[in-house]
Amino acid sequence: MAHRFPALTPEQKKELSEIAQRIVANGKGILAADESVGTMGNRLQRIKVENTEENRRQFRELLFSVDNSISQSIGGVILFHETLYQKDSQGNLFRNVLKEKGIVVGIKLDQGGAPLAGTNKETTIQGLDGLSERCAQYKKDGVDFGKWRAVLRIADQCPSSLAIQENANALARYASICQQNGLVPIVEPEVLPDGDHDLEHCQYVSEKVLAAVYKALNDHHVYLEGTLLKPNMVTAGHACTKKYTPEQVAMATVTALHRTVPAAVPGICFLSGGMSEEDATLNLNAINRCPLPRPWKLSFSYGRALQASALAAWGGKAANKKATQEAFMKRAMANCQAAQGQYVHTGSSGAAATQSLFTASYTY
């Protein structure tokens, strides 16, 4: 039976589907450069660089001004509001620099967490008020996709059914509003890696969360072909004493996705969740070699796992431009190969690439 009140026109659906497919075509993934001022400050502090708007702009200019060949591995970049309106040293808006490289521009749309009363420190996400107006303005300003991060954690009686349902509905409402305004919604339900839970526990919780999210997306008439999913990989908690291989992570992850994510979704772009750069690449490669049906493109949407080596190479010094850009390009290409199951670990990664990037209760 045809839906009596269609949410989108055929033209809107076509545009959304084409944008989503462009982002994940041929092993391409997403650079998440949407860190808030505070989060970026924590990163700069580690390399002893002051957290000023100019220093944030300079580092992002290094990432965005790399050789045009970056478009072979990066299909989209998520920006923070500040960055969307910043310019490079020649006076060109960053968003135009990216578009000229054939990269799709995205924006962070959620406004952080708010406590869910009556739960064990669980949260829901703020930002739905005024979202339609913000999306409309961002579309005019050249943005083609959005991102909304909901956070769930594994702990005593967590995640509760209330937290799962509340966050699933917020994600679905956001996705619907995005699509009405011509933006592809990246749906990000993150099960945090904090805790000592094992792989099986994370898989169980991830399946419950994803099932609720896709039920909510269906209830809200979201056009799945015009969305992307940004989930956590299924991993053991950071404090778990048992260690798992990339192949075990891959099997648990693809099994969870296979049970919950419709084949209509064009791409699944994993978050790195505080893994080292190298671990994030190895796990993604194993996922794309997993001997289970994989009807979606399985790619990456990494922040720390694409930037850590580059940030360490930069150190706040303009003279380190070449080394910074080479470090970023190397990680981007490695993840593009992993998104096609073709990455070969050479063992020649620098210290920054193998260092854990985990931060407890991580917030953007």
Swiss-Prot record:
Enzyme class label: lyase
Classification via Pfam families: Glycolytic
Modified residues (Phosphothreonine): T39, T119
Primary localization: cytoplasm
Known catalytic reactions: beta-D-fructose 1,6-bisphosphate = D-glyceraldehyde 3-phosphate + dihydroxyacetone phosphate; beta-D-fructose 1-phosphate = D-glyceraldehyde + dihydroxyacetone phosphate
Residues binding beta-D-fructose 1,6-bisphosphate: R43, S272, G273, G274, R304
Additional information: In vertebrates, 3 forms of this ubiquitous glycolytic enzyme are found, aldolase A in muscle, aldolase B in liver and aldolase C in brain.
Protein's UniProt name: Fructose-bisphosphate aldolase B
Source organism per UniProt: Mus musculus (Mouse)
Gene behind this protein: Aldob
